[in-house]
UniProtKB/Swiss-Prot annotation:
GO terms for molecular function: DNA binding; DNA-binding transcription factor activity, RNA polymerase II-specific. This is Homeobox protein vex1. The lineage of its organism: Eukaryota, Metazoa, Chordata, Craniata, Vertebrata. Transcriptional repressor. Acts in a ventral signaling pathway downstream of bmp4 to antagonize the Spemann organizer and ventrally pattern the embryonic mesoderm. Represses transcription of the dorsal genes gsc and otx2. It is found in: Nucleus. GO terms for biological process: BMP signaling pathway; determination of ventral identity; negative regulation of DNA-templated transcription; negative regulation of transcription by RNA polymerase II. It comes from Xenopus tropicalis. Keywords: Developmental protein, DNA-binding, Homeobox, Nucleus, Transcription, Transcription regulation. Residues 129-188 bind DNA. Transmembrane segments: none annotated.
Length: 282
């Protein structure tokens, strides 16, 4: 093998040159093995580096062109490795899976609907049983009202007596007393609000814990008389002219004051305010 000077042209020719022997023991060539066949050309660019033969893609291109020309197409490598079913098989399998899932979902829906219907029916039955209202007669209501006036919180002995007399269960009597207490509370609150806006607190009549005074309201409270109210109609008069002096106000017994739920809302505490002139802007 003759030695040539290394140049760019020689390197390009050597890279484009087709190797004659691809299966060559390059290690033996480097070590100077004399068994190598003579007159062979090797694709060697540099002594320290060996350029391996580049694969020839022309045969592959010709093979693909023949397949395309004949109407065939070579399958890719991943298709060769993994088997993929045909589209028709996919569609049929998908249809069967969809049908099976639809049937199972319909069955589950039917079962769920039946369960919900059973639950709703049971809940309705329980509500109907719990919401059963007791219709009291006039005699029963009269006896219950009489017992409520005596004591708003019924005891066990009174409950047993009423259940025997009125032929009612103790739970029915207990429920009636609870509802009656709530009604009494609402009536008392409404009366307080109405009395607050009217200027005089009037207690709730008809029960022993709120005794009513035995005297007339107009005679004992002359503050509400028309003569005194006419004097208070002056818009910018002094305050002491509209309020009566404490000596003219009638003395109310202390026992009656204690019977009121809120005695501070009476007209009398207004007299404790200091007397001063009202401011007149004009």
């Amino acid at each position: 093998m003759e030695k040539r000077p290394y140049s760019v042209a020689w390197l390009s020719e050597s890279s484009q040159r087709k190797p004659l022997c691809t299966n060559v023991d390059l290690l033996g060539y480097k070590s100077g093995n004399p068994d190598l066949p003579p007159n062979r050309e090797y694709n060697v660019s540099l002594p320290s580096r060996v350029i391996l033969p580049t694969p020839d893609y022309r045969e592959k291109e010709n093979y693909c062109g023949r397949n395309v020309h004949n109407g065939e197409r070579s399958p890719p490598v991943r298709d060769q490795l993994h088997f993929h079913p045909a589209p028709q098989e996919l569609t049929t399998s998908r249809r069967t899976s969809i049908e099976v899932s639809a049937e199972s979902s319909t069955d589950q829906r039917v079962i769920g609907m039946t369960d919900t219907n059973k639950k709703t029916i049971s809940v309705c039955d329980e509500d109907a049983a719990s919401r059963a209202r007791t219709k009291f007669t006039a005699e029963q209501l009269e006896e219950l009202e009489k017992s409520f006036k005596e004591n708003r919180y019924i005891g066990s002995s009174e409950k047993r007596r009423l259940s025997k007399v009125l032929k009612l269960s103790e739970n029915q009597i207990k429920t009636w007393f609870q509802n009656r207490r709530m009604k009494f509370k609402r009536q008392t609150q409404d009366a307080r609000v109405e009395a607050f806006f009217s200027g005089l607190y009037l207690p709730y009549y008809g029960y022993p814990d709120l005794p009513t005074p035995g005297y007339s309201v107009q005679s004992e409270f002359p503050v509400l008389a028309p003569q005194t109210m006419a004097a208070s109609s002056i818009p910018f008069g002094p305050l002491h002219s509209t309020v009566m002096s404490p000596g003219l106000h009638p003395a109310i017994p202390s026992a009656n004051l204690g019977s009121y739920p809120c005695s501070s809302m009476l007209v009398r505490p207004i007299l404790n305010e200091p007397t001063r002139q009202r401011y007149s802007p004009y």
